[in-house]
Amino acid sequence: GGAVASDGISEKVINLEIAYKLNYILRAYGLNTVMTRTDDESIHDSNAKTLREQKVSDIHKRMSIMESDENNIFVSIHQNKFSNSSLWGTQVFYSPNTTDSAVLANCIQNSVCSLLQNDNKRVIKKSGSNIYLLYYAKRTAVLVECGFVSNPQENKLLENSDYQRRMAFSIAFGIMEYINTKDV
């Protein structure tokens, strides 16, 4: 289920809200989008019985969706949590397997920092094996940690619908900037 904020709100609830808003904006830009989930249910195979089998199946299905078209870009929305509650800010992780992943990550990070978080000094980071989908991706793939649910002030923002919309717009703007570099 991911991180849980001190007020009890689960990361997955915030993730889905931002992802819905991002999906809406990207479709308005005329892009074809596919969401790996549209509700609070895992996408694991029905024959996966144990929690471990369900998680593995879920990851493999997401990987299959990501790899289904060579023109796909994969953007995973998440929230961060850390024991130090003063940490804040969006940070984008990218797949080590394609140079385009770093370019996309940079476009999104710069967009969020310039449009929404002017004081954010975080930089993009190459994924390690701990982020399975990015580490094994053959397509352009990034994971956007939108903020820290462990920071009370940032968590309030992350739970706010208007802030979620602005976050989604900032991410979408970065994606469009990336796409425009590919069209040149």
What are these regions (language model features)?
Residues 1-62:
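Active-site histidine-acidic residue metal-binding/catalytic motifs
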Residues 100-126:
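Active-site-adjacent substrate-binding region
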Residues 1-9, 80-107:
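A short, glycine/acidic-enriched catalytic loop
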Residues 32-37, 73-77, 91-94, 141-145:
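Structural recognition of the beta-strand scaffold that forms the well-ordered cores
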Residues 56-71, 131-136:
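Mature extracellular/periplasmic domains of secretome proteins
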Residues 76, 83, 122-184:
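Active-site-adjacent mobile loop/cap segments within catalytic or ligand-binding domains
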Residues 20-31, 38, 67-71, 79, ...:
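Sec-exported extracytoplasmic/periplasmic mature domains
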Residues 9-17, 53-60, 98-103, 158-169:
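Soluble non-cytosolic domains of exported or imported proteins
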